[in-house]
Amino acid sequence: MSLFLTACDDGSDGSTGAAGVDGTDGIAGVDGINTNNGHLQQIGRYASGIFDDGGAEIVAFDKSTNKLFVVNSGANTIDVLDISEPSQPTKLTTLNVADQDAVSFTSGGANSVAVNNGLLAVAVEADNQQDTGRIYVYNTSDNGFVTAFTAGALPDMVAFSADGQYLLSANEGQPSNDYSNDPEGSITVVDLSAGVASAAVSQATFTAFNTQQTALTDAGVRITGPGATVAMDLEPEYISFAIDNDTAYITLQENNALALVDLASATVTGIVALGYKDHSLQGAGLDGNKNDDYPVILNQPIFGMYMPDSIASYEFNGKTYLITANEGDGREYIYDTDSTTCTNAGHTDLGGGECLSHSDEVALEDLALDPGVFTADQISELQDGSGWGDLTVTNTNGDADGNDQFEGIYAFGARSFSIWNEEGEQVFDSGDQIEQIVADQSPLFFNLSNDKNSPDNRSDNKGPEPEGVAIGTVGNRTYAFIGLERQSGIMVFDVTNPFSPAFVEYNSNRDLSVDPGEGVDAGDLGPEGMIFISAEDSPNGKALLIVGNEVSGTTTLYQVQ
């Protein structure tokens, strides 16, 4: 077992050097971009009829049957769509995971789907989220149930390796709302090399790192849960694979870190701290003020915690590169109880029968800033009625000396996408480009929420929230498609050379003339799951991007041309 500790400063120095070596080739390549190759044209759309309740989340495609499997968490089912004609997606049937409940297991709903070689895998949480979940396996040909594998607590994402040998689930292990039960996060590794019937199931855990908590936190891994061990606090979120299918990369979103898993041994071999984004640097600004109702992107003495949600991988010059969507995610746990029980537990009574057991979020205006680090003018600008005081930041980072005065300000997410090498070193970050592009192309509808059309509404809380990422090749170019959850748009970047990506286009299928409360007529809201289908595998012979939109409950098919 090895432990990778990548501090912010050391990681930045390494990344800069790498970019200098390979960047020259990238410039020549970018000159040849044909932006039409990255153009997204909507050709089909399916509406689940469920609005603002997860009607379309994660999507998976089976090329042998032209079926699309869509997680419909609002109905606790998997919608099975026929996309033989992509312009007319048609619902064939639904799979109800509750049909497979047994005496020893009661399902709480499906969270994720993946397809490989005629098999559909579904990540299923237990009715009690802190209990062990399951991976259900079905045949894609007849939708018949095949088997179930025991996973960890709250399997949130499921994925096959490209060669089909391994099936993994990222088991988030979230605590109960009253924080009385905090199960360990883990990764379930199913070895399918001997076939489904003879599969070997292993649980890759983090218990070996429990004795290394100080080293991890010193390196920048966030271990912040009350009384939590390392294994309890780490929350695996999303999965991608190395190009040789020997290693899996798992985002640990709340921990601002990346886990490396050796698949052959089903062992976590490293935890990499992802560092922090310096928003005071040119090209890395942010708009943290929602009160001016207009985009004003500034450099401020604030750090962004990358905290990626989705991750995807691709090959460049024989090596694996990882792309992350740096959404950010705080922790806030609220449960229902009376005020006496709440206060006796040492928790915060919110009134109305609600009790706060734990939160790592605070408004910037409520953070005591160290006057020895921040000037009086900076403190005034950030806290005294300027609008920046509403910015959501954390109360668990920035007070290194423990004197209750914060030397650093740390916000959730980085409002960007990043590219990392196999060692978890950053080789590219999009800086403030996403906010700048939306500000330029849609200034009156900047940093919207996905459930209201109020401009600047999300500037104080993670901005456009880049959440989803898919990678695909069209011709000789490789593109990254970045889903903006709150803004409800898709950014397209040419990432053929990971050291010098280039912006291609911004696409939004949201109708801003319609109030989101009016339902499906508002267009596509809240892109969650995204997959790229190559022209070779596509039903119409054209490259496709398919997006599940969780708020509008729609599944949208784009042709990439």
Residues of each region from the PLM?
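Collagen/collagen-like triple-helix recognition
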Residues: 8-35
